[in-house]
């Protein structure tokens, strides 16, 4: 009976780890999540990883494309910071030290480190085709940083590692050798599937937020649809996303179409340029991005 009580209490304690940390609110969506790592910790790790990556990466030698990445990135960053300051997230602005780099890599990819360190691969540009397409991608990557998805996932990983380790040890001691190993594997699978779902949710949330950020910066959010269609056509597969950490292209496009009416409420066209040039395509007066959190359509 004593062993059984220890077992039950320990299992409860292990799964309670998932609720540790401080509750924080994601800008724009209003979603709350629990974070157990500090901004200082995540920024330190991020800066180390970014410095290591850039030390070996080859920066693009295309001056026009590099200037475009920096121009679009800075415009998005300004719009995002303005929104954060006007909507109660002033404290988060200090975490960003924006950098925008274009590197020589044929992969169609981009990423944004916590703290605003952004890298775009040259292989992505044929898909973005213009500044607006690039803004859709950068808005998405910036959204990951603003929503603190890295800290959220790190929190989950810490809880998983601690929880499965404790559970396996206690079960081996209270029930018998070997049982704890099986239980740890089962618990790890539970956490893995849960984290997998949350990761896909993070991607969907970043799509939504990125769409809004692009609109705030004066880029037409409707161009997200043809961009993802191009990405879908260039993808080697478009299989079901049930075991993927990213939504399928089909699901992603459908979700973006559903959110488009909300994004258009933020959209006011501004000056844009053709790819690799300084030729203006449209100009209007910049507007405020002061908007309260909007409940997302289901």
Feature-to-residue mapping (PLM):
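C-terminal motif of bacterial Sec signal peptides marking the signal peptidase cleavage site
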Residues: 15-19
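A Zn2+-metalloprotease active-site environment signal
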Residues: 2-7, 20-298
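N-terminal leader/targeting signatures
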Residues: 11-13
């Amino acid at each position: 009976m004593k062993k059984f009580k220890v077992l039950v209490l320990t299992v409860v304690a292990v799964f309670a780890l998932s609720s540790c940390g401080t509750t924080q609110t994601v800008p724009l969506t209003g979603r709350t999540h629990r974070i157990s790592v500090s901004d200082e910790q995540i920024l330190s790790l991020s800066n180390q990883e970014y410095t290591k990556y850039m030390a070996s990466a080859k920066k693009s030698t295309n001056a026009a494309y590099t200037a475009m990445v920096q121009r679009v990135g800075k415009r998005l960053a300004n719009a995002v910071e303005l929104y954060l300051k006007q909507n109660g997230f002033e404290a988060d602005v200090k975490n960003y030290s924006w950098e925008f780099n274009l590197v020589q890599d044929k992969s169609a990819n981009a990423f944004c480190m916590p703290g605003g360190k952004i890298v775009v691969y040259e292989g992505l540009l044929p898909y973005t085709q213009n500044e607006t397409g690039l803004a859709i991608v950068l808005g998405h990557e910036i959204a990951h940083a603003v929503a603190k998805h890295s800290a959220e996932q790190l929190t989950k990983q810490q809880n998983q590692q601690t929880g499965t380790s404790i559970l396996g040890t206690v079960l081996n001691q209270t029930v018998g050798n070997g049982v704890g190993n099986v239980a740890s594997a089962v618990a790890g699978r539970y956490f893995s599937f849960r984290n997998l779902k949350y990761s896909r949710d993070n991607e969907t949330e970043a799509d939504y937020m990125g769409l809004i950020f692009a609109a705030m910066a004066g880029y037409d959010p409707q161009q997200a649809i043809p961009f993802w269609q191009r990405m879908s056509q260039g993808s080697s597969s478009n299989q079901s996303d049930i075991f993927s950490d990213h939504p399928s292209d089909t699901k992603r496009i459908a979700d973006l179409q559903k959110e488009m009416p909300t994004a258009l409420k933020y959209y006011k066209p501004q000056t844009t340029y053709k790819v690799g040039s300084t030729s203006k395509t449209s100009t209007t007066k910049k507007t405020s991005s002061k908007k309260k959190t909007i409940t997302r359509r289901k």
